[in-house]
């Protein structure tokens, strides 16, 4: 079993990259893709930690985090960490997310794009802090960074900050009153198009995947048009297995995959406590992404 859509504290998850590796061992995953929003900051940490565990296991050490079935407990598997990212894009006024799998995250052009994107996000976050201060909330961007070290600050971090400092009673309240779309302290971020994201992922040697298309609430014709456009540019996969899909929705996306000769991808979209009903690997409890999905997406070695 694999999970090809996972977030860490480096974006808006609550598990560190290392904790994700430990938890993936507990869940019995053979692999997971770390796909933080618009950042690759957690990849080195997760990949390095997984390799350290493999070396320790080869030297005879046990893995203290393992809690899989008794039959496997003596030799738990350290999961492969797939280098990935989830890029924020916009298409005809809708937020569309593109997952990149197997990316060369050290590729210069890719790294340069992320640096520019992070600077743009920082400017946006400064503006949101200023608007929140106008609403009698004591917040600075420096305070956010201090509270969430190493993270690319998202609206979820704003919400958690407001919650921890007593300005709101729930994360939902933060989005309803302050930082949700069309709320008084919301500032839209600069975005690329889905087509540009596909090209960026391909340029980094990665596999571009359209993430959770059902969540965009597009008409069938409009979604079909988007997929057709992206296929022409080089889209490789589409997320047909996802935590919130029902049977009919999965069938619909599998149909699109078949129509446009796209490979199936799947994942939980695990965020830890920020999405408490969604678990790693199993989503709402019934998610299952077989290893074959990963192997079908894996690029051929050159």
Report the location of each language-model feature.
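An N-terminally biased module of ancient metal coordination in phosphate/nucleic-acid-related enzymes
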Residues: 1-94, 179-180, 192-275
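C-terminal active-site subregion of NodB/CE4 polysaccharide deacetylases
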Residues: 261-267, 272-298
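Extended substrate/RNA-proximal surfaces in nucleic-acid metabolism proteins
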Residues: 51-228, 284-300
């Amino acid at each position: 079993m694999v999970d090809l859509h996972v977030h860490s504290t480096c974006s808006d998850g609550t598990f560190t990259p290392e904790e994700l590796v430990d938890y993936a061992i507990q869940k019995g995953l053979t692999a997971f893709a770390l796909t933080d929003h618009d950042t690759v900051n957690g990849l080195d940490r997760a990949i390095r930690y997984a390799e350290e565990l493999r070396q320790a296991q080869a030297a005879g050490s046990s893995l203290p985090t393992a809690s899989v079935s008794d039959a496997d407990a003596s030799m738990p598997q350290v999961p492969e960490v797939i280098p990935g990212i989830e890029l924020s894009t916009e298409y005809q006024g809708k937020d569309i997310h593109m997952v990149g799998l197997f990316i060369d995250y050290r590729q210069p052009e890719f790294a340069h794009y992320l640096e520019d994107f992070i600077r743009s996000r920082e400017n946006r976050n400064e503006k949101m802090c200023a608007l929140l201060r106008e609403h009698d909330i004591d917040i600075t961007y420096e305070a956010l960074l201090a509270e969430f070290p190493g993270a690319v600050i998202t609206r979820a971090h704003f919400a958690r900050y407001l919650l921890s400092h007593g300005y709101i009673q729930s994360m939902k309240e933060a989005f309803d009153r302050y930082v949700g779309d069309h709320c008084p302290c919301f500032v839209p971020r600069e975005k690329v198009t889905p087509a540009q994201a596909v090209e960026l992922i391909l340029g980094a040697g990665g596999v571009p995947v359209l993430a959770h298309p059902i969540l965009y609430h597009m008409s069938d014709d409009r979604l079909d048009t988007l997929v057709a456009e992206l296929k022409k540019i080089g889209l490789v996969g589409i997320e047909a297995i996802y935590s919130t899909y029902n049977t009919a929705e999965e069938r619909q996306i599998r149909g699109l995959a078949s129509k446009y000769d796209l490979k199936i991808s799947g994942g939980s979209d695990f965020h830890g406590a920020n999405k408490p009903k969604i678990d790693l690997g199993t989503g709402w409890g019934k998610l299952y992404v077989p290893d074959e999905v990963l192997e079908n997406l894996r690029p051929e070695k050159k």
